[in-house]
């Protein structure tokens, strides 16, 4: 099905251009991830494999952190800024609430505010992360660790983050899929060969002949787990809850009844990306505070709460995923606007009063769907982390669930967008033919 869809897509010039443009932008991003920041010994980071937040940062940055490239921050600051702006729209700042109701004009203002906030966050985060890794590497990361060097590295990483954000926006506007998700998707896909190599070396290299059976069983269970995650994720991402809709006024040729489809997991994979981004950056800051010798109780507590290799950290990560799932579900689908749009189009849900009654019905339904979505996302992301801690597995396995979730969800969304565009073109072409 995928290859047939791709073949059909490449037959249409406009669709082909969009696909090739997306691939081109991803290639530009991948080239940028190979350019190491000047004055930094990136090989030192290979000695920090056991630092959990480094692996999380690498995931969110699209695998650009491993060699401390100019794109090392990736879209992480933009993601954090987006969360801040969306929170400010929830009756926290009147100006942001007002912009949220101004349609396209307000959206442009909110996007501008997001960019300014992400610029500040990127600069602070870049200096914090550089100082963290320099301290953890026993002062070997930065060649000349002075104020001027840190400011220069901060400026380079901030500029790189802004470029990556711009590349993501180009994909969203002119290519296919969500730009932020596609950037992270590309980074994860590029790291798959390295993940496979790491798992192979741990399972088979320098293993005694008597332990070979255990290694084969381990790899077999791992492959089975991957297949289960792929099937389960594909099923949930494509599952829909259909709300029956009826119309009071039937236009000529219009159906008397229809349905409103809602995804079983309306938030998609965004809550996991949000939670990963929120967890990784503060963990780096607290790590450097601790490494500098400031080991107050609250610092140790904060480290435990944000590190995904501690029970408290895993619980916090799961809680963040749950909270962001509920939050982003209501960002994606506004019950008030849905009720208003149904009423304007002369549609209603059988057994539910239009207006306020429909809004309350949608709110209850979205809470139930968000509950299902949070359990699903939590299961896929947390179980591999627990398996790592219980069986002494690598971080490649621990973050494998999150990586697979992002790959599959982004792939499905891209295919749906492509399929929808082809269907729309076919429908428009048919209408043009019938009117001639």
What does each model-found stretch correspond to?
Residues 1-98, 105-436:
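N-terminal cationic and glycine-rich segments that engage phosphates or anionic surfaces
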């Amino acid at each position: 099905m995928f290859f047939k869809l791709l073949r059909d897509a490449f037959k249409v010039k406009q669709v082909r251009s969009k696909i090739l443009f997306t691939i081109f932008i991803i290639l530009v991003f991948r080239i940028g991830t190979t350019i190491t920041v000047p004055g930094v010994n990136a090989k030192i980071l290979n000695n920090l494999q056991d630092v959990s937040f480094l692996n999380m940062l690498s995931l969110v940055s699209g695998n650009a952190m491993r060699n401390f490239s100019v794109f090392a921050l990736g879209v992480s600051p933009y993601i954090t800024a987006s969360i801040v702006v969306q929170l400010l729209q929830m009756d926290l700042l009147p100006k942001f609430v007002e912009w949220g109701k101004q349609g396209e004009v307000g959206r442009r203002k909110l996007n501008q505010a997001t960019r300014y906030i992400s610029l500040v966050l990127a600069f602070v985060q870049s200096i914090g992360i550089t100082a963290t890794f320099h301290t953890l590497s026993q002062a070997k990361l930065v060649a000349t660790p002075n104020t001027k060097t840190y400011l220069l590295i901060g400026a380079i990483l901030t500029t790189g983050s802004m470029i990556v954000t711009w590349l993501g926006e180009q994909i969203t506007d002119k290519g296919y899929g969500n730009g932020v998700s596609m950037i992270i998707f590309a980074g994860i896909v590029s790291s798959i060969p390295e993940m496979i190599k790491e798992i192979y070396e741990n399972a088979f290299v320098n293993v005694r002949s008597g332990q070979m059976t255990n290694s084969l069983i381990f790899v077999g269970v791992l492959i089975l787990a991957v297949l289960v995650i792929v099937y389960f994720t594909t099923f949930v991402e494509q599952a829909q809850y259909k709300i029956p809709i009826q119309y009071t006024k039937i236009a000529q040729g219009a159906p008397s009844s229809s349905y409103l489809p809602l995804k079983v997991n309306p938030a998609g994979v965004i809550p996991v990306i949000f939670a990963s981004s929120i967890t990784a950056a503060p963990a780096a800051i607290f790590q450097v505070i601790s490494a500098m010798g400031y080991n107050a109780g609250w610092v140790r507590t904060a480290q435990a709460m944000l590190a995904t290799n501690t029970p408290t950290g895993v619980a916090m990560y799961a809680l963040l995923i749950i909270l962001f799932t509920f939050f982003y579900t209501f960002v994606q689908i506004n019950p008030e606007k849905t009720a208003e749009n149904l009423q304007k189009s002369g549609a209603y849900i059988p057994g539910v009063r239009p207006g306020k009654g429909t809004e309350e019905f949608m709110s209850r339904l979205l809470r139930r769907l968000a509950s299902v979505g949070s359990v699903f996302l939590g299961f896929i992301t947390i179980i591999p982390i627990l398996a790592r801690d219980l069986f002494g597995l690598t971080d490649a396995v621990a973050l494998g669930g999150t990586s697979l979730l992002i790959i599959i969800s982004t792939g499905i969304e891209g295919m749906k967008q492509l399929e929808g565009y082809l269907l729309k073109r076919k429908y428009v072409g048919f209408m043009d033919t019938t009117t001639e």
